[in-house]
């Protein structure tokens, strides 16, 4: 997903997937499904947690999920003000992005173990 140029942090940068915060009363699965639906229109698929960590000093829980879906690519809807473009990438392209300067440092930290597991 390419971040909107209106975003305060990392405007226009490419991220690996959708993201956001849980709303009061949501568990992490509900939050992930809502964020994916809001940012992409994808409302179906199988989620597999690939990382979970607590980020200090914010005491925030970060969790990452891999979504497997047969959702029709023609149905992708980008969330206005959040994202401006998307692309599907292969495992090789994911690893290549992870190793490039374009990968956000926070993404690299969070995905390290997962990337090493799929090499």
Residue ranges and their predicted role:
Residues 1-34, 38:
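Conserved Nudix-box catalytic region and its N-terminal flanking loop in Nudix hydrolases
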Residues 20, 53-54:
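Structured beta->alpha junctions
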Residues 43-51:
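A short coil-to-beta-strand element that immediately follows conserved catalytic motifs
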Residues 1, 50, 89:
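Hydrophobic residues at beta-strand termini and immediately following loops
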